[in-house]
């Protein structure tokens, strides 16, 4: 039986950078990426927190959301999902709100909504988004 070697946090960071570069290269080679649209990479924001986390959580999503042209075709991308978590208004994103509440329940072992603060009252709950893994099935915005 093969023994699995645990990677260090630095090795994981390098692997994540390598995967992100591969995503950009593949999108370009397949004609999915151009001046109007680029991939939005996924992965883990805070690898140290993720490695220490118990349990380790990975959230699988359909696709990243971004802007659309007037004809309805997706555009933009090229931004980092993790940078969005550092914004003061990150908690207002409706896609992330249920994720935040579920993570709060998991990590703080809360079984009732009544035991939780509202995100608007405790914006630090948004920090939970940084310690899990994200996988978008499609890396392209709104496709």
Can you annotate each of these PLM segments?
Residues 2-143:
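A polyanion-binding, active-site-adjacent surface
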């Amino acid at each position: 039986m093969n023994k699995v070697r645990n990677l260090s946090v630095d090795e994981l960071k390098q692997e994540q950078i390598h995967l992100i570069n591969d995503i950009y290269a593949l999108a370009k080679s397949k004609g999915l990426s151009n001046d109007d649209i680029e991939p939005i990479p996924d992965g883990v924001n805070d690898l140290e927190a993720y490695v220490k986390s118990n349990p380790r959580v990975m959230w699988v999503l359909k696709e990243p959301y971004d802007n659309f042209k007037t004809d309805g075709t997706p555009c933009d991308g090229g931004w980092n999902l993790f940078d969005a978590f550092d914004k003061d208004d990150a908690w207002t994103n409706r896609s992330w709100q249920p994720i935040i509440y579920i993570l709060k329940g998991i990590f703080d072992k809360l079984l009732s909504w009544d035991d939780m603060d509202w995100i608007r009252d405790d914006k630090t709950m948004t920090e939970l988004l940084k310690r899990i893994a994200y996988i978008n099935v499609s890396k392209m915005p709104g496709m």
